Amino acid sequence: MSVVSIEELEKARAYGRPLAGLDLGTKTIGVAISDLGLSFATPRAYLPRKKFQEDAKALLHLLSRENAGGVIVGLPINMDGSEGPRAQSTRAFVRNLQPLTKLPFAFWDERLSTVAAERALIEMDVSRAKRAQRIDSAAAAFILQGALDRLQALRADPGG
């Protein structure tokens, strides 16, 4: 399927199924899954990055296993609002993944999601070594939660 706006995702997603959130890092792919009511995002184990074909196979397997009805992908926008090489790389990954699945994709501004995730893990007194293992999936949960909150607001006020 194609990339849709967050507003269009409500109609494009498969109803009764959770949404997945992704944080595409250079070494790992952070993953989070929503509940069926699309209220809460929960981090899942990250996927180590390899070559695209291997990444795609592992990711599509995970999305199938979780019965995801759509995918929110964190878009690393610069603080000034511009898109740099990381955003271009993220868009290219999704563009290459689209022909392999019928799931709709939506991008979500991920600015400061990793910072927020790290602060949350520090507040939970997670050791530095374990934070390194959990940071990408925690960031994916922050990304997904932001999108879920927006979807909830759209359902409450369809005009805005």
From Swiss-Prot:
<dbReference type="Pfam" id="PF03652">
    <property type="entry name" value="RuvX"/>
</dbReference>
<keyword id="KW-0963">Cytoplasm</keyword>
<dbReference type="InterPro" id="IPR037027">
    <property type="entry name" value="YqgF/RNaseH-like_dom_sf"/>
</dbReference>
<dbReference type="InterPro" id="IPR006641">
    <property type="entry name" value="YqgF/RNaseH-like_dom"/>
</dbReference>
<dbReference type="GO" id="GO:0005829">
    <property type="term" value="C:cytosol"/>
</dbReference>
<keyword id="KW-0690">Ribosome biogenesis</keyword>
<protein>
    <recommendedName>
        <fullName>Putative pre-16S rRNA nuclease</fullName>
        <ecNumber>3.1.-.-</ecNumber>
    </recommendedName>
</protein>
<comment type="similarity">
    <text>Belongs to the YqgF nuclease family.</text>
</comment>
<dbReference type="GO" id="GO:0004518">
    <property type="term" value="F:nuclease activity"/>
</dbReference>
<keyword id="KW-0540">Nuclease</keyword>
<comment type="function">
    <text>Could be a nuclease involved in processing of the 5'-end of pre-16S rRNA.</text>
</comment>
<dbReference type="InterPro" id="IPR005227">
    <property type="entry name" value="YqgF"/>
</dbReference>
<dbReference type="InterPro" id="IPR012337">
    <property type="entry name" value="RNaseH-like_sf"/>
</dbReference>
<keyword id="KW-0378">Hydrolase</keyword>
<dbReference type="GO" id="GO:0000967">
    <property type="term" value="P:rRNA 5'-end processing"/>
</dbReference>
